[in-house]
């Protein structure tokens, strides 16, 4: 039963957040019943060295338990390097095209597959992958069970 609830939560959460991105106005909502962030209210963090920004939406990815994080890969061929996470992660592409590669050979030009808006991706725990954006920003909703860490791996040439 617990596994069914967890699966249901992972499937419904992206729909809720996708709906939040499409809201144009929401006058008169009771904050005891509903809280929300419109797209222009997302407090994106600074752009990191790989070219991504993030904002924690729910939970704390550094601690045990469920979390959801917005991640924005900025355009301009910005990619993470090959790495893995200890736990499965579930990703919905909300905007743009996200490019995903697997394995220790880093080759953004020939080794990636495009994931357009609406795509759902599972990064399985302890499996090497890398990802990013090419010619447009890519906004993602990443969900999982913390703690969420990343372990870099040696790249193959």
Regions found by a protein language model. Give the residues of each.
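Short beta-strand His + acidic residue motifs that chelate non-heme Fe in jelly-roll/DSBH
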Residues: 80-82, 100-101, 123, 128-134
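Double-stranded beta-helix
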Residues: 33-35, 128-157
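Short acidic-glycine-tyrosine-enriched beta hairpin
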Residues: 62, 104-126
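C-terminal segment of classical bacterial N-terminal signal peptides
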Residues: 18-25
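Conserved short histidine dyad/triad with adjacent acidic residue
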Residues: 67-85, 124-126
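Bacterial N-terminal signal peptides that target proteins for export
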Residues: 2-15
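A short, N-terminal "cap"/entry segment at the start of jelly-roll beta-barrel domains
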Residues: 25-70, 155-157
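Glycine- and acidic-residue-biased ligand/ion/polar-headgroup-sensing regions
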Residues: 74-77, 84-106
């Amino acid at each position: 039963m617990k596994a069914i609830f967890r699966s249901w939560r992972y499937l419904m959460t992206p729909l809720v957040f996708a709906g939040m991105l499409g809201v144009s106005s929401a006058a008169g909502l009771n904050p005891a019943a509903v809280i929300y962030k419109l797209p222009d209210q997302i407090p994106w963090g600074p752009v990191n060295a790989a070219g991504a920004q993030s904002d924690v939406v729910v939970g704390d990815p550094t601690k045990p338990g469920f979390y959801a994080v917005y991640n924005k890969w900025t355009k301009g061929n910005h990619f993470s390097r090959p790495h893995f996470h200890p736990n499965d992660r579930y990703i919905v592409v909300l905007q743009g095209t996200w490019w995903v590669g697997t394995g220790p050979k880093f080759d953004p030009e020939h080794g990636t597959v495009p994931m357009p808006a609406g795509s759902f991706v599972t990064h399985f725990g302890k499996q090497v992958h890398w990802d990013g954006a090419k010619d447009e920003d890519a906004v993602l909703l990443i969900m999982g069970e913390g703690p969420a860490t990343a372990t870099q791996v040696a790249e193959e040439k």
